[in-house]
Design a protein with these regions (language model features):
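Conserved beta-strand hairpin/beta-sheet module of binuclear metal-dependent hydrolase folds
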Residues: 3, 8, 13-64, 151-167, ...
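Active-site metal-binding motif and surrounding structural segment of the metallo-beta-lactamase
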Residues: 54-101
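Short, basic/aromatic-enriched C-terminal tail that caps enzymatic domains
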Residues: 273-289
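Active-site environment of divalent metal-dependent phosphoester hydrolases
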Residues: 33, 81-83, 106-107, 148-149, ...
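Metallo-beta-lactamase
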Residues: 102-153, 157-160
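Metal-dependent catalytic neighborhoods of phosphoester/phosphodiester hydrolases
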Residues: 85-94, 109-112, 249-256
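Cap/insert and terminal regions of metallo-dependent hydrolase folds
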Residues: 174-277
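Active-site neighborhood of phospho(di)ester-bond hydrolases with catalytic His/Asp-centered motifs
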Residues: 48-51, 71-79, 99-102, 164-167, ...
Length: 289
């Protein structure tokens, strides 16, 4: 593998706009046209995926009220364009360490040779199952089933709070369900409606890919997970439906399916948090934990 591993950097304290809370999560964009999520504590700032260009990334950060003075890490879930198209620009702005698995990095070197074709400094090689720290945030990478080189999801823990980001997966293995338990903020894919996908504009081969066990979660699959107390433990303060297809789903339908599923839970396992839907076009309100 032709990239180097550097020592982890601590983040400076007290940056402009520091937040007197445990953790703030800003979902700046979510969908097939670009994904971008920022996690912040008073000390640390982590960007998960970089699917938007420089101008739009800066605009989304400003719209979410986030300081853009420094960034401590960029984490990439997998190499598909909607998760890394803006990565060269993001790294050019902030010079932040890049956390990525070796198979994903190999694909980035192939897909973006001008940026990643040479030996790089400031790259942290990670793997599924690994725990590591970025500033005062503990990160755990876990494997997800998707048609990419080495796709991963993440959980983040700090100051007694836990956040999980889990999108781009074809089904819900038990290990994934395990990682999503006891979260305060769960960001979960609800990509498509089965009927809309079947009659939609995608070619047959793409429909088969989306429906496969390495494709994307449907509203129905998410509903089955949310209705099952042995799957979703309902502890989350925020449940965010994410990566919603613009062609084969709509936010209202995804929300309706999730609400119906949550309504089927036994009373003793009722969900009392806030159900939200992330957007491709504008940042979701910052979620404070």
């Amino acid at each position: 593998m032709s990239f180097s591993v550097t020592a982890r950097r601590e983040s400076p304290c007290g940056f402009k706009g520091a937040i007197p809370i445990g953790l703030r999560v800003s979902i700046l964009a979510s969908g097939s046209a670009g994904n971008l999520t920022l996690l912040e504590t008073e000390r640390t700032r982590i960007l998960v995926d970089a699917g938007l260009g420089k101008r739009e990334t800066l605009a989304r950060l400003a719209a979410a009220g986030s300081d853009i003075g420094h960034l401590d890490a960029v984490l990439i879930t997998h190499e598909h364009a909607d998760h890394c198209n803006g990565l060269p620009q993001v790294l050019g702005i902030w010079k932040a360490p890049l956390y990525v698995t070796e198979p994903t990095m190999a694909q980035l070197q192939h897909n973006l040779p001008e940026t990643f074709g040479k030996r790089l400094r400031g790259v942290e090689s990670i793997q599924a199952g690994q725990r590591f720290a970025v500033g005062d945030i503990d990160v755990h990478a876990f494997a997800i089933p998707h048609d990419a080189a080495d796709p991963i999801g993440f959980t983040f823990r700090t100051n007694g709070s836990k956040v999980a980001i889990c999108t781009d997966l074809g089904y819900m293995p038990e290990l994934v369900k395990f990682h999503l338990r006891a979260t305060d903020c769960l960001i979960l894919e609800s990509n498509h409606d089965l009927d809309m996908l079947k009659v939609g504009p995608y070619p047959w081969v793409v429909k088969q890919r989306v429906l496969s066990r390495t494709g994307h979660l449907s509203n129905h699959a998410v509903s089955e997970f949310l209705a099952d107390p042995e799957g979703f433990d309902s502890r989350a303060r925020y449940l965010v439906l994410a990566h919603i297809s613009q062609e084969n789903n709509n936010p209202d339908l995804a929300r309706l399916c999730a609400e119906e599923a949550l309504g089927r839970r036994p009373a003793e396992f009722a969900f009392s948090g806030e159900l939200l839907v992330a957007s491709q076009h504008a940042p979701l309100k910052p979620l404070e934990l």
